């Protein structure tokens, strides 16, 4: 009985070993028996056939060389130690997809040998490959013809204010037409009390007329002052232009204060007077801005014009980066052409329909790059296997070689929306698209950074004079300028002999005159007083005063050329002065008080009043130099309350302007000359401790 069971037990054990050895091999190999219970799964995404690698069969399908003792059937032994990996077997045929396993991903296998070259045939379009390396720049292509000019786009938002342009050339503009009277302005704050002016003559009160102001009437006799009347209603007229100062009237006797009389009724409106003489006006105050008018309707689009010439390259500043656009559909790779020169920017094309995203591909493990073999035939895409267990993400392998471009395939069915892929490198510039229709106006973007200053444009036509702007703040005090070069001596003046003046103080001894003709000897006389000054050389030119009282100037010599030397004109006989202003924005309507004197011969200039009183009659030269800041300036040189010359400067914002004027005047003793701003609407006279406005005058020749 025992001998009968022993061969049977050996046979059962041998069968068990065969079953254990063949079972895993069948499961791993994917035989027919293993795949009987799983139907092949079809996927929409075609799979690309890759290089055939070595099968991972280390340690499988080999017999274990272990002693097999005869043990009972129900006795289980301990698992033995793992055996050594056997030799690599030949690659088997590809089997059907097996049941998805639950194990961990294995190690990367070695690349297999290159297969024999296959037959070339037209394959189906595969998924987009990895972007290739940027090739060398191609030869420049032919210049394309300019495209058809597109329709004018919508008006963009206003840009940021640019930097102030350079100062233009100042030319006098044409006087504009009389503007529409503006609404009455708000009542201003009371200004500071001015200094009392010289008392003027009191004239008769005229009737309220509605015409233009007539010629000034003759001054009447001083009447008794009436009582203060009730304040009348506020007028609605605009302030008139400042008229020219009238001629000074005869000084009348001041009458005794009278009893205030009752307020009389307004008289009848007088007839309209003749138009007055055109006066020299000043710009009126700026009116209130009018309400903003409604925006006009959009005009009809004009006819398409001919294509314009290519303009010069602009120097615009970069705009703000726009929002990130949606990822477009992956296009079919086209044939690589020669790289041409970048074409001109075309008009935006019409937005195409958004393509459907392809299905996500199965993540494969990147193998080590093998040696480049000959290209094999592209096989048919096999049926997709069931999704495997996601493996551990491997390191990114090197970029593969660029494949041959395939023929565009037919449009497939829309796949499910895949996850967003990584951002690829920047592609080559595409061809210029067709001009698209105007898009919907987007929302206003944020204000961009201040761009670089552009090149100054061409000077535009002179505009009409603008309204008077508000006075700006006083700027910081600048540095004193460099001393100017001394001017050339002027030509000798042609004056007539004046009347003999009053005897001045005794001057220094003059240069001895040339000896005269010897006369007959006279009787000896008593000792006389000191000799009179030497003869005055009429060809001398006034120059610099010397400490000894003489004048260093030029003398006309031979040929009319000046010869510099020591003249004989006494400094005590030449009234002259120079005064500067050390405070900005003096009051208008009264003499400007140049408060610091640099030289004041004969003390003819009074810095407390700003008036020069003529001490010696003769021909004088006066000059004034002023700085302008904050607003326009209108300066006049007055002689005995009558303007002699006017100077007007239109202020440019952001600059410190200069204005000057001068005149030669004939004065009698006690005549008065001063500088004054006639209007308070153009009173931008500026001066500081280190930026001086000055007033000078000196006697050219006595009369």
UniProtKB/Swiss-Prot annotation:
Proteolytically cleaved by neutrophil elastase, in vitro. Prolines at the third position of the tripeptide repeating unit (G-X-Y) are hydroxylated in some or all of the chains. Residues 70-544 are annotated as: Disordered. It holds the Pfam family C1q. The keyword Signal applies. Induction: Some up-regulation in diabetic nephropathy. Expressed primarily in the subendothelium of large blood vessels. Also expressed in arterioles and venules in muscle, heart, kidney, spleen, umbilical cord, liver and lung and is also found in connective tissue layers around hair follicles, around nerve bundles in muscle, in the dura of the optic nerve, in cornea and sclera, and in the perichondrium of cartilaginous tissues. In the kidney, expressed in mesangial cells, glomerular endothelial cells, and tubular epithelial cells. Also expressed in mast cells, and in astrocytes during the repair process. Expressed in Descemet's membrane. Residues 29-76 are annotated as: Nonhelical region (NC2). Residues 570-703 form the C1q domain. One of its GO terms (molecular function) is extracellular matrix structural constituent conferring tensile strength. Residues 79-97, 506-532 have a biased composition (Pro residues). Residues 1-28 form the signal peptide. Residues 77-536 are annotated as: Triple-helical region. InterPro entries: C1q_dom, Collagen, Collagen/C1q_domain, Tumour_necrosis_fac-like_dom. GO terms for biological process: angiogenesis; camera-type eye morphogenesis; cell-cell adhesion; endothelial cell proliferation; extracellular matrix organization. SMART domains: C1Q. Residues 537-703 are annotated as: Nonhelical region (NC1). Keywords: Angiogenesis, Basement membrane, Cell adhesion, Collagen, Corneal dystrophy, Disease variant, Extracellular matrix, Hydroxylation, Repeat, Secreted, Signal. It is found in: Secreted, Extracellular space, Extracellular matrix, Basement membrane. Residues 206-224, 433-442 have a biased composition (Gly residues). Macromolecular component of the subendothelium. Major component of the Descemet's membrane (basement membrane) of corneal endothelial cells. Also a component of the endothelia of blood vessels. Necessary for migration and proliferation of vascular smooth muscle cells and thus, has a potential role in the maintenance of vessel wall integrity and structure, in particular in atherogenesis. It is linked to Corneal dystrophy, Fuchs endothelial, 1: A corneal disease caused by loss of endothelium of the central cornea. It is characterized by focal wart-like guttata that arise from Descemet membrane and develop in the central cornea, epithelial blisters, reduced vision and pain. Descemet membrane is thickened by abnormal collagenous deposition. PANTHER family: COLLAGEN IV NC1 DOMAIN-CONTAINING PROTEIN (PTHR15427:SF33), EMILIN ELASTIN MICROFIBRIL INTERFACE-LOCATED PROTEIN ELASTIN MICROFIBRIL INTERFACER (PTHR15427). This is Collagen alpha-2(VIII) chain. The lineage of its organism: Eukaryota, Metazoa, Chordata, Craniata, Vertebrata. The gene is COL8A2.
């Amino acid at each position: 009985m025992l001998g009968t069971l022993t061969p049977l037990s050996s046979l059962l054990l041998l069968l068990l070993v065969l079953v254990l050895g063949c079972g895993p091999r069948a499961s791993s190999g994917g035989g027919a028996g293993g795949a009987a219970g799983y139907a092949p799964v079809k996927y929409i995404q075609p799979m690309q056939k890759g290089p055939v690698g070595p099968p991972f069969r280390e340690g499988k399908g080999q017999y274990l060389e272990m002693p097999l003792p005869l043990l009972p059937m129900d006795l289980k032994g301990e698992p033995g130690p793992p055996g050594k990996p056997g030799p690599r077997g030949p690659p088997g045929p590809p089997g059907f997809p097996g049941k998805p396993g639950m194990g961990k991903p294995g190690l990367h296998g070695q690349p297999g040998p290159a297969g024999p070259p296959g037959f070339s045939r037209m394959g189906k379009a595969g998924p987009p490959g990895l972007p290739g390396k940027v090739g060398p720049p191609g030869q420049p292509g032919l210049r394309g013809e300019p495209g058809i000019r597109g329709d004018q786009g919508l008006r963009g938002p206003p840009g940021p204010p640019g930097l102030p342009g350079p100062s233009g050339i100042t030319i006098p503009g044409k006087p504009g037409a009389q503007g529409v009277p503006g609404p009455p302005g708000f009542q201003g704050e009371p200004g500071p009390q001015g200094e009392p002016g010289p008392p003027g003559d009191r004239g008769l009160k005229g009737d309220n007329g509605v015409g233009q102001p007539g010629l000034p009437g003759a001054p009447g006799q001083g009447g008794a002052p009436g009582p203060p009347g009730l304040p009348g209603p506020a007028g609605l007229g605009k302030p008139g232009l400042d008229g020219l100062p009238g001629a000074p009237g005869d000084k009348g006797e001041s009458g005794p204060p009278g009893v205030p009389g009752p307020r009389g009724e307004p008289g009848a409106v007088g007839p309209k007077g003749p138009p007055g003489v055109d006066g020299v006006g000043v710009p009126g105050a700026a009116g209130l801005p009018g309400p903003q008018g409604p925006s006009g309707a959009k005009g009809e689009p004009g006819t398409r014009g001919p294509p314009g010439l290519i303009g010069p390259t602009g120097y615009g500043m970069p705009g703000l980066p726009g929002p990130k656009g949606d990822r477009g559909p992956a296009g079919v790779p086209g044939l690589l052409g020669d790289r041409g020169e970048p074409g001109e920017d075309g008009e935006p094309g019409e937005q195409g329909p958004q393509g459907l995203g392809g299905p996500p591909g199965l993540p494969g493990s990147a193998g080590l790059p093998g040696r480049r073999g000959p290209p094999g035939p592209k096989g048919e895409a096999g049926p997709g296997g069931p999704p495997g267990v996601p493996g551990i993400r491997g390191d990114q392998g090197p970029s593969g070689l660029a494949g041959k471009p395939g023929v565009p395939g037919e449009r497939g069915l829309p796949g499910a929306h895949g996850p967003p892929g990584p951002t690829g490198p920047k592609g080559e510039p595409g061809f210029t698209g067709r001009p698209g229709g105007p898009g919907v106006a987007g929302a206003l973007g944020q204000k961009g950074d201040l761009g670089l200053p552009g090149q100054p444009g061409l000077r535009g036509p002179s505009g009409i004079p603008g309204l008077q702007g508000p006075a700006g703040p006083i700027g910081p005090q600048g540095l004193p300028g460099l001393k100017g070069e001394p001017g050339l001596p002027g030509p000798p003046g042609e004056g007539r002999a004046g009347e003999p003046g009053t005897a001045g103080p005794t001057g220094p001894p003059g240069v001895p005159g040339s000896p005269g003709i010897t006369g007959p000897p006279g009787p000896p006389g008593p000792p006389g007083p000191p000799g009179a000054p030497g003869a005055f050389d009429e060809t001398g030119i006034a120059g610099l005063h010397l400490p000894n009282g003489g004048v260093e100037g030029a003398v006309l010599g031979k040929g009319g050329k000046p010869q510099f030397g020591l003249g004989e004109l006494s400094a005590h006989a030449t009234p002259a002065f120079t005064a500067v202003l050390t405070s900005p924005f003096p009051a208008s309507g009264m003499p400007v008080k140049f408060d610091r004197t640099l030289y004041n011969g004969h003390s003819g200039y009074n810095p407390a009043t700003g008036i020069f009183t003529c001490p010696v009659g003769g021909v004088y030269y006066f000059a004034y130099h002023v700085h302008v800041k904050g607003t326009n300036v209108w300066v006049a040189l007055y002689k005995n309350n009558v303007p002699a010359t006017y100077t007007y400067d239109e202020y440019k914002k952001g600059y410190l302007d200069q204005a000057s004027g001068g005149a030669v005047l004939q004065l009698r003793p006690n005549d008065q000359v001063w500088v004054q701003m006639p209007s308070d609407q153009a009173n931008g006279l500026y001066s500081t401790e280190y930026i001086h406005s000055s007033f000078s005058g000196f006697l050219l020749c006595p009369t």
